[in-house]
Amino acid sequence: MRSLDYAKVITKLVSFIQEKVEESNVKGVILGISGGVDSATVAYLAARAIGKEKVLGLVMPYHINRDVEDALLVCNNLGINYKVINIKSIVNEFEKNLDFELNNVSRGNIMSRTRMILLYAHANSKNYLVLGTSNRSEFLTGYFTKWGDSASDYAPLINLYKTEVWNIARILGVPNEIINKKPSAGLWEGQTDEKDLGITYKLLDEILYRLVDLKMKKENIARELNIPLNKVEYVESLIKKSEHKRKLPIGPEI
């Protein structure tokens, strides 16, 4: 992986948040806090950038589990304002009005988009910016809900790979129990990122960095990492299949 000066990266991230709040002439920032390392890291950066009193965290569970405890741990450790909104009744009401059965993925997308709506409703009422929590690994592979968790005003972590976010989280003092637990979007019980993606973040990031940033040939990546070529091809396919998710809707030129 690339070698980063994490002290400089953190300074850059903090300055970025400060600048965008000032440029946008808003009173603060809001973000969804899931109990995972990405949202925790953004919360820690935001509190450092503009002060804890200008940061609002929304904890929006569908399932009541350890993630809620971890989300509250982040809020309480930082001393930021927060609200807990259980989205189960909202999602269930939506589902009741559909004339077809939802699978886990469709329901998960509705959950993610419900959270986006709640974030923007609160942001509009308070004149806040919405901070996104997506990282580069998710962004490049399309591991996010279009118009859901990908929707934000600014995304501080969007150019950092997941393994790099873990390193930044450690430096910022994010609790170890959050850093060390298996990453999950929390869309259904037992769901984990790496199970969905079919690859560990450590290997995924090594491949992505070489494919996208270094623009290495697939055969050379496989040789350098001592992995089968089809692993590299699989990651490449994730990037290609999700291209539409990284762009605004387009139409033909007239």
Curated annotation (Swiss-Prot):
Molecular function via GO: ATP binding; glutaminase activity; metal ion binding; NAD+ synthase (glutamine-hydrolyzing) activity; NAD+ synthase activity
Keywords: ATP-binding, Ligase, Magnesium, Metal-binding, NAD, Nucleotide-binding
Residues holding deamido-NAD(+): 113, 146, 153, 244-245
A Pfam family assignment: NAD_synthase
InterPro entries in the cross-refs: NAD/GMP_synthase (IPR022310), NAD_synthase (IPR003694), NH(3)-dep_NAD(+)_synth (IPR022926), Rossmann-like_a/b/a_fold (IPR014729)
Cited SUPFAM superfamilies: Adenine nucleotide alpha hydrolases-like
Protein name in the entry: NH(3)-dependent NAD(+) synthetase
Organism: Thermococcus sibiricus (strain DSM 12597 / MM 739)
Lineage of the organism: Archaea, Methanobacteriati, Methanobacteriota, Thermococci, Thermococcales
